[in-house]
Swiss-Prot record:
NCBIfam families xref list: rpsC_bact
Cited Pfam families: KH_2 (PF07650), Ribosomal_S3_C (PF00189)
Stretches the record annotates as Disordered: 214-243
GO annotations of cellular component type: cytosolic small ribosomal subunit
Alphabetic keyword roster: Ribonucleoprotein, Ribosomal protein, RNA-binding, rRNA-binding
Name the UniProt record assigns to this protein: Small ribosomal subunit protein uS3
CDD domains: KH-II_30S_S3
Gene Ontology molecular functions: mRNA binding; rRNA binding; structural constituent of ribosome
Cross-referenced PROSITE patterns: KH_TYPE_2, RIBOSOMAL_S3
Annotated Basic and acidic residues bias: 229-243
Assembly information from the UniProt record: Part of the 30S ribosomal subunit. Forms a tight complex with proteins S10 and S14.
Length: 243
């Protein structure tokens, strides 16, 4: 099922955490959940050019703290902080509470799955060939340290009469390995022929390196290969790693 499920939801509580971090009783939960949805929809619509990777919402006692992860924080802050102050006031009106707004810069947008998907969507809307856009994104991600990346584009690609799905992968993307740090993002391209959907998976390495069970398992795998193969520097069987 690791191939089908959302990789981020699959790893919540293991090596990922939630984007909404607050607690509410039954009476308040629905109202606060809809507030979160409205805040995210508003920010993504208003700050489309700022490259929003994710929005984290925390709710300390009778307050709201919103953290925006952006590839271009200067567009959000504005000249002398004027734009960010307007944004903070708007969010305060939406939540009816004191709102703190934090901006975090995404240092490497080329290996952020959501930003990669948004970039491909923008290229498709400008009529760039989908294969060229996918291959360029894959090469940039691998150059900047990703261990693997997979991209799928679905829809009337190139204006074809029949919709189809094309995908491109480079490196390893072990979706069923829970210790793997896999980022996942989606975007939609509104082309002249209809909407095309883009999905991106990026494998950044294994997070639970300190896990004693993982270390012991790797040691057993090394012993199973025998000393001759280790002396030659043979690479371990990829199928065994993904098992």
């Amino acid at each position: 099922m690791g191939q089908k499920i959302n990789p981020i939801g699959f790893r919540l509580g293991i090596n990922r955490t939630w984007d909404s971090r607050w607690y509410a009783d039954t009476a308040e939960y629905g109202k606060l959940l809809h507030e979160d949805l409205k805040i995210r929809a508003y920010l993504i619509k208003e700050l489309k050019q700022a490259g929003i990777a994710k929005v984290v919402i925390e709710r300390p006692h009778k307050k709201c703290r919103v953290t925006i992860h952006s590839a271009r924080p200067g567009l959000i802050i504005g000249k002398k902080g004027a734009d960010i102050e307007k944004l903070r006031k708007k969010l305060s009106e939406m939540t009816n509470s004191e709102t703190h707004l934090n901006i975090v810069e995404v240092r490497k947008p080329e290996i952020d799955a959501t930003l990669v998907a948004q970039s491909i969507a923008q290229q498709l809307e400008r009529r760039v060939a989908f294969r060229r856009a996918m291959k360029r994104a894959v090469q940039s991600a691998m150059r900047l340290g990703a261990e693997g990346i997979k991209i799928t584009c679905g829809g009337r690609l190139g204006g074809a009469e029949i919709a189809r799905t094309e995908w491109y992968r480079e490196g390893r993307v072990p979706l069923h390995t829970l210790r793997a740090d896999i980022d996942y993002g989606t975007a939609e391209a509104e082309t002249a022929f209809g909407i095309c959907g883009i999905k991106v998976w990026i494998f950044k390495g294994e997070i639970l390196e300190h896990d004693p069970m993982a270390s012991e398992r790797r040691g057993l795998e090394g012993d199973a290969q025998g000393p001759a193969s280790r002396e030659r520097g043979d690479r371990p069987d990829r199928r065994r790693e993904n098992a």
